[in-house]
Amino acid sequence: MMQLSGRRLPLAEIAQVALAREPVEIAAAAKKAISASRGVVEEIVARRAIVYGVSTGFGKLADVHIPSDKLEQLQVNLVRSHSCGIGRPLSAPEVRAMMLLRANVLTLGFSGIRLEVIQLLVGMLNKNVCPVIPEKGSVGASGDLAPLAHLALSLLGEGEAFFNGERMASASALEKAGLQPTDLRAKEGLALLNGTQAMHAVGGLALFRAKRLSRVADVAGAMSLEALKGTPVAFDERIHNARPHPGQRAVARHLLALLRESEIRDSHAKDDPRVQDAYSLRCMPQVHGAVRGALGHCEEILAIESGSATDNPLVFTDNGDVLSGGNFHGAPLALAFDYAAIATTDLMSISERRIDRLTNPDLNEGLPAFLAQHPGMQSGFMIAHVAAVALLNEAKVLAHPASVDNLPTSAGKEDHVSMGMTGALKLRTIVEDAENVLAIELLAAAEGLEFRRPLKAGVGVERAFTTLRGIAPRVDEDRALSTDIERVAEAIRNGQFDGGDDRL
């Protein structure tokens, strides 16, 4: 049972709730902070003070003062009017991550929301009630307004939700789960809507997958190196100690472990006329390592965000101040997602170059053209490489940063926005493309190893080869490879090619 207290949540813990449905609960200490924060708001309402988000309109309409008898309707109107998302619904894991992240930051006690509203959100999460949240419509400032509005709408028993995978009216989903919808009181609608948790959920789960891919790339690259009769000399620790980037050194160690006890290497270690391998093989530590470093940096940013108050205004219980600021602005995440997208695309790029070397008879060290047993009669992996190129092209287009764009909204009041949700959605697509490109490389490299038999590759490579052959058999004759690619990509997502005991 995960305790929610506003602490930082690592990606692995978010994934555990989003994917494995680990239950959560609000920590006892957090309940006190929540109640104290709510007390400040109720005191403001009691003395009829003019405070943004409590007794005023929103955005450009912040100068409009709302009568005290209309404060609850104001919050309901906010949720309904902002529920204008567009497109396909976010996946259940993405919505679950979004609910987790929003509940966690609300427990910090800066939002002035009642404990029972957060408890309903947690109850929905634990009982698998997932609001239907369209994926498009957020510019990432003032937070993810439209997606979070759809989330809040379900708490009211309005809109739609999935219950155990079945789409229905939110009121029905809550009833089936044994939950009651809530009302909204002063500031509570705004407390639910102001935040970065939609982009955080989508981009965070994509980043979790990208970090896994950065390890899978080592496995695929090591297998390709063996199939191409490459050398591990470039991974010697002395080289990498001379340029001690942590990711580079870790990848070099990982590759050496994967390639340990290679019979293929022993067969050509002496008197090999080749001096050094191509960059796509020789520079794996430098490239894969840089990707690891980039993704690690992005993960640190998301960890900070997971325990940060992104509401506006913020309630401070030590002296009762309610201060307007801009913590809802998604710039930190938007820049991180763009960085992760570029890094993941580069990982795809070097993988595609290795696929080309495996299939190109002028470069593949004696392997048959396109890895076909009877080239000409058979086309082998010719079009599998073309598919990888198509995916890489899409990723390169999507790697253009979303965060450098800006369009003012709310009649110029909100004149700079992050476009973080766009960045998160792009990253998700790029990661999916990368999973498929690495699946193609694994399939092609395994096929190359078949032509090196009876010699065995390194112990780590052989383990990965055995795993792959449990998913996709050798291509003895031409067949449709789409199913093989899909199955291997799914195995990548499930962690079957992370590197086993050789993971570093």
Please place each PLM-identified region on the residue numbering:
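Conserved, non-catalytic sequence blocks in retroelement Pol enzymes and Pol-derived host proteins
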Residues: 110, 139-141, 376
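C-terminal auxiliary extensions adjacent to catalytic cores
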Residues: 1-22, 26-33, 37-45, 67, ...
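Glycine-rich, flexible loop motifs
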Residues: 3-41, 45-48, 78-134, 207, ...
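Membrane-embedded alpha-helical core segments of multi-pass
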Residues: 125-129, 147, 218
